[in-house]
Every structure is written in C-alpha cells, then in structure tokens.
A protein has these predicted regions:
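Glycine-rich phosphate-binding loops of nucleotide-dependent enzymes
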Residues: 1-239
Length: 239
C-alpha cells in the first residue's frame, strides 16, 4: 500500500498543497480530480520526490519510508511516475525507450518476459518496436510512456493526465489498458480532468481544491452524489 500524509508545498508565499493525505492499495485505481491549478500535478511530483516539501511529509510504500528517498531510488522501491509530458525520448525507438525503463534491481521476471507483458497490453507497440517515437501519434506515445514505466515492475504507478489530448476512442482504449494493469496487481494513482471516463474505471477518488483534499470516497458514490457533482465536478471535462 502507498500511504501519503502531511504533504505541503509552497512557492514563495503561495501554498500549493496543504497537508494532503491519501492511500492507494495495490490492485486498485484511485483518481484525483480537480480544476486547473488545484494542485494535482504538484501532489504527484511531491509523492515521487521531485519537489521540496515542508517538514513532516510522509510517503510509505509497503511499509518502507520513502519520504527522504531520491527519485531514482523511489523507482527502485516500486513507485513509477508517467509525467504529463510523457517523459519519453522522442529520437529513440519504441524498443529503446522500453529498454531504458527496465530495472534489474526489481527483477521478478526477465526483461524479455516483462516486455512481452507490456506488449500484450499495447499490441500496437509490438508492430512498431523499431519506429522512432517522434513519428508516432500522441496516443501511441502515451502507450510508450506507460509501457516504459511498467518495465520497472512498479507496485504503484502514478499517471499525470494520461488522457490529455487523446481522442475519445483512444481514451477508452487507454483506460481499458489501465484496468488490465490494475487487475495484474499494480496500484494506479491518476490525476485527471476527464471526470466521467476516469471515475468509470476508478475504485476510489479524491477531490482537490486550492491545494486541499476536500472530499473522497468510492468512485460510484462520487458519480452519484449531486452535491459533489455541483461543487467539485461541474466544471470538469466529461461531467
């Protein structure tokens, strides 16, 4: 389980996050919903160790304290991040990008076996292993980014706006793949503005407003609660 508590981030006098706390179990999808500027991306980066936080931050994964662990060591501990910009190498091929994601220190299976699992999730990538990522569509590049993160065999996968810029068809394909990843035992924490699609696949959700978590619950409860929809979801895409 990923356990996060007391995460506060400030930029000068601006408090971007205030004592954020959440949990993610392996084998579940948790979505963070909020408007632009709510602090969603800041929260993911803080969890991944990419931003300085106020004293008191706690991040634990499987009982291990990751609060002061460097980002590359966090990956080795079982936490992987797919950033909004995808973080892939556009001038390299699909195969080369996947290879860069491999983490021999977490070798529960061979690299070839793990790549076979990734290509099973995203069959289109198997047909394009020698293709340069720069020549691929946005949806295909997102698949490469997620595939590369999965090559590290994470226990928890963090995804920042994975559906951003994708067509409705590609969003459905992507979220179907995320369900399969969840069912394989990986926990997923998504930052999303696409409320309808993300809540449809999520097990639980958190509502973030002005840097504070102002609500959480089962995804079905959030979908059906009129007050929640009006107060927190009404301005988000897909609602």
């Amino acid at each position: 389980m990923l356990e996060v508590s007391d995460i506060s981030v400030s930029y000068g006098q601006h408090r971007a996050l205030s004592e954020a706390a959440l949990t993610v179990e392996r084998g579940e999808i948790v979505v963070i919903l909020g408007a632009n500027g709510a602090g969603k991306t800041t929260l993911l980066k803080a969890i991944a160790g990419l931003l300085p936080c106020a004293p008191g931050k706690r991040v634990r994964l499987g009982g291990r304290d990751l609060s002061r662990v460097a980002p590359h060591d966090i990956v080795e501990a079982g936490l992987a991040l797919v950033p909004e910009g995808r973080g892939i190498f556009a001038d390299l091929t699909v195969a080369e990008n996947l290879l860069l994601g491999a983490n021999p220190k977490r070798a529960r299976a061979s690299e070839a076996e793990q790549r076979a699992k990734v290509l099973g999730l995203f069959p289109k990538l198997g047909e394009r292993l020698k293709q340069t990522v720069r020549t691929m569509s946005g949806g295909e590049q997102q698949m490469v980014a997620i595939g590369r993160a999965l090559m590290s065999r994470p226990d928890i996968l963090l995804l920042d706006e994975p559906s951003l810029g994708l067509s409705p068809l590609l969003v459905r394909e992507l979220f179907a793949a995320l369900r399969v990843i969840r069912d394989s035992g990986v926990g997923l924490l998504l930052v999303e503005q696409n409320a309808r699609e993300s809540l449809a696949i999520a097990d639980r959700g958190y509502l973030l407003e002005n840097g504070e978590i102002v609500g959480h619950g089962r995804a079905m409860e959030l979908q059906s609660d009129p007050a929640v929809r009006r107060a927190y979801l009404g301005g988000l895409a897909g609602v």
